[in-house]
Amino acid sequence: MQTIFVMAKCALGQAYEVADAAIQEVEQVSEVHSVSGQYDLMMKCYLSDEADIGHFVTESVQTLPGIADTFTIIAFKAFS
């Protein structure tokens, strides 16, 4: 299982709609948080080991209405 975080900039006034769409339409998105800073949202996504991260981001996340820009972070290890 691969864990990635996708930071998203949204069109003005669209962050809540983008968050709702990400949770409802993209199966791999497990959490969406509104954040401060350069980006509006942070999405936590779980992908299969075989999944291509680039294709997932460009085809499933960047195509959501209201997404203006993304930045992807790949997690190496989760600590508990």
Language model features with spans:
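A compositional/biophysical signature of low hydrophobicity enriched in polar/charged and small residues
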Residues: 1-80
